[in-house]
C-alpha cells in the first residue's frame, strides 16, 4: 500500500456476506462495532459448510424452525470485538434482536437448541432465534385477611421465622460460591446458564380470592381478603456507600436495570454507574485507601425477570449478605457469601419474597415487618467479614455498600398499612 494511503481505508471494505447479515441488524447504534462483530463471525462460519446459509435462513425467517449455528467456545467463554469482551450469544442477540440487551441473565435457550451457552460444550450456538428474553413474572397480589383464620400447615414462612426470631450470631457464618452451593436442596434448572442455583421453593397454594372455589383442605377458609398488588417503582433500588461505620457521599438511585458500582471516577454522571472513586472522606485511613485501590471494576448489579444478580467484575472478591439468597440455599439468614472474581450470584428472587409475604400476613404485623430485613442487601469489597475473618461485622470492613430494594419495601409498606397497628408495637427494645 502506498505510504500516503489513509489508515482508515484499510477498514473501508465490507464483504458482501457481512453486508447481507448487517441488513437484519436491529437499531442504529454502534454501527462500526456491529460490523466488526459480524465480520468476525463470518470468518468463523465460512470454515463450516452450510453455517452461513443456516444463519441467513434463521434471520430471514424468524418464525420458522432453524438449526444451531455454532462457533468454538473460547477459554473464558467470551469473545473480543474491538477491545470489548462479551459472551458470543449475547453479542449476536444484541446485533440481530435486542439492541438494549445488557447481560446473559436476560437470555434463556429454547429447548430446540443443542449447543446453548450454558451447556459448556466445545461449541456454542449464536443463532439469535435459539434464545428467548426472560420475562418478568406477574406477582399475585397479597391477600390481607380482615379476620385471620389461618391454619399454619406446610408454611414456607416457618423456616424463615424460626431462624429470624433467634438472636443473630456474634459472627455470621460464611459460604463461598460455588463450593458451598453444590449441595443445595434442588438441582439447577438446565435453562440457567453457568449457575448451580436451585429454583426457589415450590409455593404452597395462594389464598383463594373471595368467591372462588375453595379446596376442603385449604389452609385459608371463610376469610375476607383485601388484595395488595405489587407495583414496579421508578428506581428499583438505592445504593449507599460506607467506609467502616461512616456513610460517605449521596445515595445512588438506580433506574437502569443494569448498574455498575466501581472504584473509578466518572465525571459524566452516567446513570448506569455509581463511581466510588469520586467520593471523599476526611476520616479515611490507610487501610481504606488501600482497599479502595483494589475495588477496580467492582460489582455489576442486574435486575432481570424479577431477580437481582450480583456479578463480581473486580479482580478481588466481593462478600454478600442477602437473607433472600440465604433462604433459597438453606443457609443461616446472616450468612455472608463470598463471590470470587468473574462469578455471579442471584441475590434476590421476587417470587420467593411474594410467597413468604403472602403467608406472613396470617401470622401478624410483627412477622410481616420482619421481612423488611430481606429487602436490604449488604456487600463488602475486597475484605470479608464473619466467622472465617477477623472482622465480625460489616461495619468493620473498609468499603461496603447497602442496597435497598424499593419494590419489595414499598409492597411491604402497603401490606403493613392495610394490616393496621401491631398487637405488640415494635420498638427499639422489641
UniProtKB/Swiss-Prot annotation:
The keyword ATP-binding does not apply. It is found in: Cytoplasm; Nucleus. CDD domains: MH1_SMAD_1_5_9. Phosphorylated on serine by BMP (bone morphogenetic proteins) type 1 receptor kinase and activin type I receptor-like kinases (ALK-2, ALK-3 and ALK-6). Residues 236-430 form the MH2 domain. The keyword DNA repair does not apply. Residues 186-222 are annotated as: Disordered. InterPro entries: Dwarfin (IPR013790), MAD_homology1_Dwarfin-type (IPR003619), MAD_homology_MH1 (IPR013019), SMAD-like_dom_sf (IPR017855), SMAD_dom_Dwarfin-type (IPR001132), SMAD_FHA_dom_sf (IPR008984), SMAD_MH1_sf (IPR036578). GO terms for biological process: BMP signaling pathway; bone development; cartilage development; hindbrain development; midbrain development; regulation of DNA-templated transcription; SMAD protein signal transduction; stem cell differentiation. Residues 16-140 form the MH1 domain. Pfam families: MH1, MH2. Interaction with the co-SMAD SMAD4. Interacts with PEBP2-alpha subunit. Interacts with RANBP3L. Transcriptional modulator activated by BMP (bone morphogenetic proteins) type 1 receptor kinase. SMAD9 is a receptor-regulated SMAD (R-SMAD). Has been shown to be activated by activin type I receptor-like kinases (ALK-2, ALK-3, ALK-6) which stimulate heteromerization between SMAD9 and SMAD4. May play a role in osteoblast differentiation and maturation. Belongs to the dwarfin/SMAD family. This is Mothers against decapentaplegic homolog 9. It comes from Mus musculus. The gene is Smad9.
